[in-house]
Regions:
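Segments forming oxygen-rich coordination pockets for charged ligands
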Residues: 1-151, 165-169, 182, 203, ...
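Short, acidic/turn-prone active-site loops that include or flank metal/cofactor-
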Residues: 136-138, 154-158, 176, 198-203
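Short hydrophobic/aromatic-enriched beta-strand-loop microsegments
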Residues: 150, 191-198, 217-224
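Short amphipathic alpha-helix with an adjacent loop that forms part of the alpha/beta core around
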Residues: 156-166
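ADP-ribose/adenylate-binding Rossmann-like module
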Residues: 169, 174, 185-210
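Beta-loop-alpha module in the N-terminal Rossmann-like domain of NAD(P)-dependent dehydrogenases
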Residues: 177-181
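Active-site capping/gating segments
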Residues: 200, 218-249
Length: 272
């Protein structure tokens, strides 16, 4: 059973879900759950294993689901007597630990030029699973992207075949308007939490006008971040790349750009 539970955790994380794994670390008295009992719960509601059933398990499940939402590991201890935490009659105590496992964020970089490489170099320090796509093997190779998965081929084909999920961010930084347009058309309707395209305002406007002519992109094109990234006040490639990744994390975490100093001063003013 333990192997099945661990496999469940791995499989659900691979599918892009957060998962809680609860282990009872100690018990005494007549606790229905014994030390070593395990239970895993996926963000999607699926579960496997048991930590004793009844009121105890129900309480642990509620707290484990809350831990998934809060993204926080928790230790717990419950008194199982009549006057204890759960109003149970079996007596004893149980202690345990719930750990949250997270899916690794995937970053698809379309375009292996200087901007794509700069985005990659920063992204690998942030624990992204990086995939680089290009139609030029002299750019998209393991010398330039040693820790990425490399996919080289005709853009139409490789973009059609690349797999995405809700943990995927997509950065489109190809060498030309025509390739950017193909990338947006192939990827914008696929699942992702972020998709952005580089380009000047004129280039972006032209690309969007062309894409919007096709009704199948009507509901999805608005999720495209273009021009991509934050305004860093610089044309340096590494700073542009940093602005792109900052935008990705802001979108992922449901935030907007803000200086902590300004937020702090606003809070002070409200308390005056």
């Amino acid at each position: 059973m333990e192997r099945d539970i661990l496999k469940f955790v791995n499989d659900e994380v691979e599918r892009g879900y957060k998962v809680s794994l609860t282990i009872l670390t100690d018990s005494d008295g007549s606790s229905p759950g014994k030390a070593g009992a395990m239970m895993a719960i996926s963000e999607n509601g699926k579960s496997i294993g048991t930590v004793g059933g009844g009121s105890l398990e129900n309480k642990i499940m509620i707290e484990a689901k809350k831990a998934i939402i809060d993204e926080k590991d928790v230790e717990f201890e419950y008194n199982l007597g009549a006057n204890g935490d759960l109003g149970m009659l079996c007596g004893g105590n149980v202690r345990g630990y719930t750990k949250i496992f997270y899916p690794q964020n995937k970053l698809i970089i379309v375009g292996a030029g200087h901007v794509g490489k700069a985005v990659y170099e920063t992204a690998v320090t942030l624990d992204f699973d990086v995939i680089v796509l290009d139609d030029r093997s002299e750019y998209a190779n393991y010398d330039n992207f040693p820790n990425a998965k490399i996919i080289v081929g005709d853009y139409e084909k490789i973009l059609e075949e690349v797999e995405t999920d809700k943990t995927t961010a997509i950065v489109i930084v190809t060498r030309g308007h025509a390739y950017d347009k193909v990338a947006v058309e192939k990827l914008v309707n696929k699942e992702s939490f972020y998709i952005g395209m580089i380009g000047s305002k004129n280039k972006v406007f032209k690309t969007l006008q062309e894409i919007k002519k096709d009704a199948k992109y009507k509901d999805s094109i608005d999720k495209l971040y273009a021009p991509i990234g934050l305004d860093m006040g610089s044309n340096k490639v590494k700073e542009i790349a940093l602005g792109i990744l900052c935008e990705i994390f802001l979108v992922k975490n449901g935030k907007k750009p803000a200086f902590m100093r300004d937020l702090f001063q606003e809070k002070i003013k409200k308390n005056i």
